[in-house]
Swiss-Prot record:
The lineage of its organism: Archaea, Thermoproteota, Thermoprotei, Desulfurococcales, Desulfurococcaceae. Keywords: ATP-binding, Hydrolase, Nucleotide-binding. The keyword Lyase does not apply. Belongs to the THEP1 NTPase family. Pfam families: NTPase_1. ATP binds at residues 8-15, 101-108. It comes from Staphylothermus marinus (strain ATCC 43588 / DSM 3639 / JCM 9404 / F1). Has nucleotide phosphatase activity towards ATP, GTP, CTP, TTP and UTP. May hydrolyze nucleoside diphosphates with lower efficiency. It comes from the Archaea. Its EC number is 3.6.1.15. This is Nucleoside-triphosphatase THEP1. It catalyses: a ribonucleoside 5'-triphosphate + H2O = a ribonucleoside 5'-diphosphate + phosphate + H(+). InterPro entries: Nuc-triphosphatase_THEP1, P-loop_NTPase.
Length: 184
């Protein structure tokens, strides 16, 4: 079991690197499951929320919306609990059953407010499948961090100085290593 961890400040390119790695894995015949939660902006470039997307089926729904009424809030964003919980549960269940590699972008305060995410994340972290994990740079949850770091890890902290190089070399490096792990 091995975790590839991507972290860094907001806007540095973590999701770009994650997507690059996932696409490179897929092109090499490796089955990737999991979730990603990209931000959504309106026509003026103003962030209005976050989607949750199943990496295997591409099904998507709202994770959180700006000024959305919800019992669970993170800053100005209300969690769309029913929709996000359903997609998270199904995406991570399928990833555990059918994928060679599990990807999650990201493990952060917003996602961790969702009970289903915490429950499924624990199952993912206990799985022996290789994982590509984007971790919020301020994540301080000891129970989650302990589970992430109890196995072999490669951690990459993205900066302005290394992101271009990492986008060039890391996806292929990970493909070669994962092919050895899963014997594909």
């Amino acid at each position: 079991m091995k975790n590839y961890i991507i972290t860094g400040r907001p806007g540095i390119g973590k999701s770009t690197l994650f997507n690059n790695i996932i696409n490179t894995l897929r092109k090499s015949g490796i089955i990737v499951g999991g979730i990603k939660s990209p931000e959504v902006r309106d026509s003026k470039g103003f962030r209005i929320g976050f989607k949750i997307i199943d990496l295997m089926s591409n099904e998507e729904g709202w994770l959180a919306k700006r000024n959305y009424y919800s019992t669970i809030k993170v800053g100005k964003y209300g969690i769309v609990l029913d929709e996000s919980s359903r997609i998270i549960r199904e995406a991570l269940r399928k990833a555990l059953e059918k994928a060679d590699v599990i990807g999650i972008d990201e493990i952060g305060p917003m996602e961790l407010k969702i009970h289903v995410f915490r429950t499924m994340l624990e199952q993912v972290l206990n799985s022996d499948k290789p994982k590509i994990l984007v971790i919020h740079y301020r994540l301080r949850d000891p129970s989650i961090l302990d589970k992430i770091y109890r196995v072999e890890n490669e951690k990459y902290v993205l900066t302005e100085h290394n992101r271009d190089l990492l986008n060039k070399v890391l996806p292929q490096k990970i493909v070669m290593e994962i092919k050895q792990i899963i014997k594909k």
